[in-house]
Amino acid sequence: MSSERKAYDVTVVGGGHNGLVAAAYLARAGLSVLVLERLAHTGGAAVSAVAFPGHPARLSRYSYLVSLMPERLVTELGLDIELASRTTASYTPTTRSGKPGGLLIERPEGPATAASFRTLTGGDEEYAAWQAFYAEVTRFAEVVAPTLLDPLPTERAIRDAAEADVWRDLVARPLGEAIERRFSDDTVRGVVATDALIGTFASLDDPSLIQNRCFLYHLIGNGTGEWRVPVGGMGAVTGALAKAATEAGAEIITSAGVSQIRAGDDSAEVTWHDGHRAHTVTSRHVLANVAPWVLRILMGEGEDPDTKPQGAQVKINLLLDRLPELKSGIDPRVAFAGTMHLAEDYSQLETAYADAVAGRVPTVMPGEIYCHSLTDPSILGDARAGMHTLTYFGIHTPAALFEQDREAHKAEAVARALAALDEHLVEPIASYVATDASGRPCIEAKVPQDVEADLAMPGGHIFHGDLDWPWASNRARLETPAQQWGVQTDHASVMVCGSGARRGGAVSGLGGHNAAQAVLGSR
């Protein structure tokens, strides 16, 4: 601790990106702010690191892309960050009747996209359906996105501003119904559906509509839904946030493990340990940038295994000597520049879900690949010419699959993930993978349990729990600033400021911004 100060206006528990956003806003408003981070560095999941000894490449190991962070937030905090657009939105390699091909979607879409749809589907109808569907999604995003930095709108307000058919397709009915009704090609259906399944374990027909909520969050960022690459890696984003917070006067202490939060009516006490001794600090407000499940434990409510979130993803980071060649003949610099969909046909997604529900690692692993170094070569450092990073995000791999014999099942999942890529490559991916200083392949894999161990996200759930609609129900109590901003807990002095907030999830800063506004509104 840089001082023996015992009281602050606000203590933020957790120095991930949302905690840093909250600290920056509150310190700029003149409040005294203390941020306590368990790890030796800030940033949480939004960090960059040298993953492979002997290579300077800095990988974004957990979080990869930015979409939901409002440009207004970046401007208000004066963040010196650059978010680069990818020239390819997505490429989906295919094999039909033994012939390799693929679906290319440019950014922005142009003649090559239309031609790719035509070649894949045999006509222009599917691309017309695609354009109509995403035009509707964009119009809905333009309704929702402007509300994200304001107090929660009601469901009625959003519904009244939306088109009735769009509300039905995206909000009222399971998303799978709209996809099956509006598209006929299995691959096209799958490309649409995958945004509903990132970090979310569900069937596309799930009556809970969790898949709809996930889809919505992935498509509303800044009203466009574009996912961009942070130049310098995800660590550049959180580095800029930490700088903004400290320059405004916030105090950040790392290697500070919080063990207890005691809430009173007008203040709360936080107990933390620096590795040598315990400290206690009192604040008018405590903002929890930890999962709500973890917060309940810190507040003395005990662990409840039945409500513990469960992540459902496999993350694989690779460093390559060169980009792989694809059997379809497409330029690898085009194919890998965006999101590459693997084994994500609609039918494959549903089959993989059924496999996982039955307790099996999916026989055919659906997932996505990103090559950030094509958009941002700076993350490679002074690596050899031709080298590239490659990141795989596998879906429908819930934590339960890895509870028993974790390493064996992890190896099985990795093998199946890479096999889904190998199917479309001229040579197996293993022949492209670089080796580290000890001669080992530059491959690291993380299942949900690894994410939990590294980042204390319960169950390895990347959103801290299931996402919720970014508006309040018509019957919601919106009497206090915390309720109005969607950051309330059962204690007036404690608020949620992370991904577990009403509009949390992804690298957006929304949880931090909204908790800060609730604090300022409570003064």
Predicted regions, residues:
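Rossmann-like flavin
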Residues: 99-207
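Mid-domain catalytic core of redox enzymes
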Residues: 230, 256-382, 486
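N-terminal glycine-rich phosphate/pyrophosphate-binding loop and immediately adjacent elements
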Residues: 4-143
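C-terminal segments that line or cap access tunnels to active or ligand-binding sites in enzymes
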Residues: 324-449
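A glycine-rich dinucleotide-binding beta-alpha-beta segment and adjacent secondary-structure elements
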Residues: 185, 189-205, 364-370, 427-502
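Short coil-to-beta-strand
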Residues: 105-106, 208-215, 385-394, 490
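Helical element adjacent to the flavin cofactor pocket in flavoenzyme catalytic cores
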Residues: 218-267
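A conserved FAD-binding loop/helix module that cradles the flavin
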Residues: 499-520
